[in-house]
């Protein structure tokens, strides 16, 4: 019986190079290919795939991957049924844990979370953000960061043109 192949999810994007460096320091050589999400790794029992960090927890939960590197924020956001094996403290710019913050301009009238009651909050982590404000009994409307209504290019006529 052949040895099973371990399916590993590596983050693409800003954590891609720091993750490859981390594996390099551990003795695994990961070699990326242009326009290909399946880098080579110098271990015949491992196959790697570059994935969005947001998707890695769900890919593990669904059995597409056996393990992967992602943030606890995305495990919490996706509510994926996975086991966190280890905390790896690294990022694209430091060796400190990443953190999500509520940011406003210094001269903003909003200086504490309660000041945002009834406002729209744009975030990548809608579930985490909603839960944060709900735990504090602050009613807000969360939306995906960058989401905008699609512009209407035409006006629907009340009578279809084919009648």
Residue ranges and their predicted role:
Residues 1-163:
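Domain-level signature for soluble enzymes in the chorismate/prephenate branch of the shikimate pathway
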